[in-house]
Every structure is written in C-alpha cells, then in structure tokens.
Regions:
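Thiamine diphosphate
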Residues: 1-174
C-alpha cells in the first residue's frame, strides 16, 4: 500500500504542484497549452500562488522577469514552441539581466507526442536552446519528478539564469 507521499509522487503533475508550493513559488506565469490546462486551474486555486495568464510568450517572459525583480519566486509554464518564439526576449532580457526563472516547458513534438504540427518544433527545441545558451534538461520519466523540479529551480537560483525543464505529457498533464 502506498503512503500519501508516494501516491502524490506517482501522480507526477500533483508532485510538480506540491514541489512548487513547498519551494515557495508565489507567481506562475503561463500561456495556455492543452497539456497545461488542469494544472493551471489547480495553481489558480492555490492560496499562496498567483497565476498570471499571458496572451503570448514574450509577454509571459516579461511579466515573469518583472515579478522576479519584485522579489517573488516565479515560474513560467509554457510549451516548447512558446520558448522558441521568445528567443530575443530570452537573450536580451532574462539572460542578459540574469533572472533566475524556473521554466516548466511542455515538450511537444517528441516521439511520445508525434502530432504532425508539433514534430518540427520538437526537432528544433534542444538545438535552439543550445544555440541561445538556455540552460535546460529533459525530465527522466523513471525518476521521481519532484526532485527534478527542485533541482531545476535550484540551478536557476544558484546560476542566476533561466532554466528550462522539458517535460513530457505524464509530467504535466493532469
């Protein structure tokens, strides 16, 4: 029989939310994506968190940087295609001014998500991230997700830079 902690960790999106709560994230900025729908509803219901819904990714990045500048621990929840479209803002704002932002990124267009219109974005994601110097890693589905989120958040803080954690459907979709 599983303990309640093991059950939460078994449901990876619950573990992500629990980790954000435990680490004291006060603001989450997002551009909606079908995988993110339910976790965003749950974040919006969290007493200690504010969910800000942006209309596009560069706006989300600017809001997240402003929130962080105001001293609030902030996370971005966006799709990988959204990060691709915020390239200039990422380089000239978030990286230039060393904002420690945790970016939880739904990784669309992978072999596990072979929707034809996502595949080109999936192929481009990691090469573009490397090209603009965006620190990132992919989650490991065989390891608990909570510590992976915590490690990514710690890296962003310690390195004073944005860090993108690329997440599969099982990590983020409720």
């Amino acid at each position: 029989m599983k303990t309640s902690t093991e059950a939460l960790e078994a449901h990876r999106p619950s573990a992500v939310l629990n980790t954000l709560r435990r680490l004291g994230f006060g603001t989450v900025v997002s551009v909606p994506d079908s995988w993110l729908g339910e976790i965003l509803i749950r974040i919006d219901q969290e007493p200690g968190m504010t969910l800000v819904r942006a209309t596009h990714e560069e706006e989300a990045l600017a809001i997240a940087c402003g929130s962080r500048l105001g001293g609030v621990r902030t996370a971005l929840l966006v799709q990988n295609a959204g990060v691709l479209s915020m390239g200039a803002g990422m380089v000239s704002l978030a990286q230039r001014y060393q904002f420690p932002l945790l970016m939880l990124v739904s990784y669309r267009g992978t072999p596990d998500d072979p929707v034809f219109y996502h595949v080109p974005k999936g192929r481009a994601t990691e090469p573009v991230f490397r090209g603009i110097g965006l620190a990132h890693t992919c989650t490991d589905r065989y390891r608990p997700i909570g510590p992976q989120v915590e490690h990514a958040a710690t890296y962003a803080e310690e390195a004073s830079c944005p860090f993108a954690l690329l997440m599969g459907r099982e990590d983020i979709q409720w």
